[in-house]
Design a protein with these regions (language model features):
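Unchanged
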Residues: 4, 18-122, 131-156
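Gly/Ser/Thr-rich helix-start
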Residues: 11, 17-18, 125
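N-terminal strand-loop-strand
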Residues: 1-14
């Protein structure tokens, strides 16, 4: 996310945003993917929709839509106001135990799954969602949940 945003600035996230009039969550996810990272909606097969869940600190409701990018094509920053950079990370890197840890925001007791991939520190809701999708997809590997790392200032 762009450092110019008012919430979750500088954090790693998936494309997303509000649902426009006449859209459902899946249509909104595909539209936002196109607007933010130039993902062609026709290249994605929606695989699942998670239940709505409020995300701290704003507690805005988020409905994750998970898809299979069946026809990869070049993507990149589509909205410089919202997106600082775009990264694609192979599943093999995400499940590598060397890239997994437990993330903790200083001053808070709550932790989330974390990932150190492609020079990024992934944590919070995005870390939880990635970890959940890897588990549900049956590709998760055991990792050291006792390896607790503080969220760096640039990712808070």
């Amino acid at each position: 996310r762009s450092s110019r945003l008012s919430s979750h600035a500088g954090q790693v996230s998936f494309p997303g945003g509000g649902i426009d009039a006449g859209e459902d969550a899946q249509q909104a996810a595909l539209r936002e993917g196109h607007e933010e990272v130039r993902l062609e909606p026709a290249s994605v097969r929606v695989a699942a929709q998670f239940p709505e869940l409020p995300v701290a600190p704003s507690f805005r409701p988020v409905t994750p839509v998970v898809g299979w990018w069946r026809e990869p094509h070049p993507i990149g920053v589509g909205s410089e106001i919202e997106v600082a950079s775009v990264h694609t990370v192979p599943v093999d890197e995400l499940v590598d135990p060397a890239h997994r840890f437990t993330a903790r925001l200083p001053g808070f007791d709550r932790t989330t799954p974390g990932f150190a991939v492609d020079g990024l520190f992934v944590w919070g809701y995005t870390g939880w969602l990635l970890s959940t999708v890897l588990q549900l997809g049956g590709v998760d590997r055991p990792w050291d949940t006792d390896d607790v790392r503080e969220v760096p200032p640039d990712y808070r």
